Structure formats: structure tokens, C-alpha cells
């Protein structure tokens, strides 16, 4: 009788993906309020995050996002470059309002600015790099969800998701899991159905990689043109090493210039026009 095959539960599969993306890798520093999410510490002094708490807080954050009736009133921010693409992809599938890049001061507090918005929920990628948005949210009593590392301050953060918020793979996976959980709760995606969106689409990509591709394509195009040219026989070039016999023994430049007009006989005709 064949042995029964073991199948991972959805939570176990999510934790396996977190381990692959190094979501559990923290920093050498740890905040006092983040100490309860730390599982252990390596010999190098790097703190490891308990992924059970990460998965639990991720589900709590997804429930908070679903409670907002209008998805556009959920603002997702990321001043860190590694999280810009993940924020845009998350907002595309969830329907939230993304702000990738620099946060304009006064977005939540100054009504005169053109970028003024009044959201009901804020999702931040890093409490340190997104400190301006978190500070403004405290002025307007706006609840905040944030991806927090072991050294992240929890000031103005209501729901902290403990994870590695500095790696591009970790940030992409966390937003992918959060978007999938939101779709589960909205009943737009069944839990027994796999999501056809790959995690790779949430990864940040270096713009320099796209700048090098056109040069490579131009070189290959030139090589193809050279290879497609027909083999035309080349005509032999004249031998310039041969010397005219009439000038072989002549060393006088006057003899060499025989038959040519004398340069000294040139008359300036400009005086005639004057």
C-alpha cells in the first residue's frame, strides 16, 4: 500500500514562502515593543522573527482593510524604493490608493495642497522611512498598519506586522500575501483556489537592467545584418608601392611639378572689384 502523501495547509505553505523570502530575518538591534515578536538570535547577533506572529498579524491587518467600504479610502505608502512596485501592484488588485516615493508634507493635514486626501486607513511599508506620513496620521486620528522590523519604532502604529521590511523579496511577498488575504475575505477568491498572480510581479526591478537591454539588441541587430550580407567578391586594390619610371630618378621638385601652373603667378583679383 502506498504511503499517504503529505499536503501542506495554507498556513504552512505561507510560512514556507516566508522562509524562502527571508521574512524572518531581522536586524541586530531590537526595539523594546518588538521584543515579543522575536523568536531567537543567531550567533552573529541577528534577531529572528516568529513567523506565527507574522501570519497572525497579517490576517488581522487584512480584516481591518476589508472593513473599509470604499477601497480607495485605504492609502498604501512606501518611501523605500524596494516597496514602490509592491505598493502599486497591491493597490491594483485591492483597489487602494498608492503613494510610491516621496511623501508630500501636508497630504493629510493641509487642505490647500492639491494632493490633500482624507483616507480612513493608512498602510506603511517602513515606520522609519514613512515617518512623515505616520506623524500626520496621528494628527487626524487615522489608524495605521505597518510592516515593522525588529528595530522599527511602534509610535503611531496600531497594527504592526513583524517582518523583514528591508529586503525586496520580503516586502514583495508580504504585500502579495496581504492582497491575497484581502481577496479571500472579500470572497473574490476562494481559499481552495490558487491565485494566478505570481509573487515575482511584486518584486522591485532595477531600472539599470532595462537601460542595458536596448544596447544589447542593437548589437545583435548589427550582427544579424552583417551575417545576412551576400558574399560579394572584392576587387583587388592597386599596388601603391610601385613608382612611376619617369619620376624614379628625379629628386627635383620642379621636375615633379612639370606641367602644372606656377603658384607664384597667382594674381589677386580682389583689387579689381574695389
From Swiss-Prot:
Ribosomal protein listed as a keyword: yes
This protein's GO CC annotations: cytosolic small ribosomal subunit
Top-level taxon of origin: Eukaryota
Gene3D superfamilies linked to this entry: Glucose-6-phosphate isomerase like protein, domain 1 (3.40.50.10490)
Family: Belongs to the universal ribosomal protein uS2 family.
UniProt main location, coarse: cytoplasm
Localization in the cell: Cytoplasm
Functional summary from the UniProt entry: Required for the assembly and/or stability of the 40S ribosomal subunit. Required for the processing of the 20S rRNA-precursor to mature 18S rRNA in a late step of the maturation of 40S ribosomal subunits.
Keywords, alphabetical: Cytoplasm, Ribonucleoprotein, Ribosomal protein
GO biological process entries: ribosomal small subunit assembly; translation
Stated name of the protein: Small ribosomal subunit protein uS2
Xref: InterPro entries: Ribosomal_uS2 (IPR001865), Ribosomal_uS2_CS (IPR018130), Ribosomal_uS2_euk (IPR027498), Ribosomal_uS2_euk/arc (IPR005707), Ribosomal_uS2_flav_dom_sf (IPR023591)
UniProt GO molecular function: structural constituent of ribosome
Cross-referenced PANTHER family: 40S RIBOSOMAL PROTEIN SA (PTHR11489)
Organism: Theileria annulata
Oligomeric form and interacting partners: Component of the small ribosomal subunit. Mature ribosomes consist of a small (40S) and a large (60S) subunit. The 40S subunit contains about 33 different proteins and 1 molecule of RNA (18S). The 60S subunit contains about 49 different proteins and 3 molecules of RNA (25S, 5.8S and 5S). Interacts with ribosomal protein S21.
Coiled-coil annotated residue ranges, if any: none
